[in-house]
Swiss-Prot record:
InterPro entries: Ribosomal_uL13, Ribosomal_uL13_bac-type, Ribosomal_uL13_CS, Ribosomal_uL13_sf. Belongs to the universal ribosomal protein uL13 family. It comes from Desulfitobacterium hafniense (strain Y51). The keyword Ribosomal protein applies. The keyword Ribonucleoprotein applies. The gene is rplM. Pfam families: Ribosomal_L13. This is Large ribosomal subunit protein uL13. The lineage of its organism: Bacteria, Bacillati, Bacillota, Clostridia, Eubacteriales. Disulfide bonds: none annotated.
Length: 143
């Protein structure tokens, strides 16, 4: 018996919706990255995108434990000398909670072209409204 290798065009993709209300950011991001990679499937193949689509709702209600809201910084750089921009997570969660969740999930995906392809299947929304009802997403619960 030979080892099974998934083919990219033979993968059936489902849509899952995760409610982020009251969940720690790290646990939410870990589970979302697991689904995006396809590690929950028996047909997981590391070099093929076998993952499913993930919709995260209620991003503004995600929880950061400890003092991370005040101490953790979101950093980005313009590419120019002195171009480092720092934003505390408290301000980021007030203005753009979607970006905080996307940043956490992206850091848990592979840092290559395959990871970029997986990242395109992530959709994050501030509240419970999302435009993907036509895809009939299944609810995914995190303990």
């Amino acid at each position: 018996m030979s080892t099974f290798f998934a083919k990219a065009n033979a993968v059936e993709r489902k849509w899952y919706v995760i409610d982020a209300a009251g969940l720690p950011l790290g646990r939410l991001a870990t589970e979302a990255a697991r689904i995006l990679r396809g590690k929950h499937k028996p047909t997981f193949t590391p070099n093929v995108d076998t993952g499913d689509h993930v919709i995260i709702i209620n991003a503004e209600k995600v929880v950061l434990t400890g003092n991370k809201l005040d101490q953790k910084m979101y950093r980005r750089h313009s590419g120019y000398p002195g171009g480092l921009k720092e934003t505390p997570y408290r301000k980021l969660m007030q203005n753009m909670p979607e970006r905080a969740v996307e940043h956490a999930v992206k850091g848990m995906l592979p840092h290559n072209k395959l990871g970029a392809q997986m990242y395109t299947k992530l959709k994050v929304y501030r509240d419970e409204n999302h435009p993907h009802q036509a895809q009939q997403p299944e609810a995914w619960t995190i303990q």
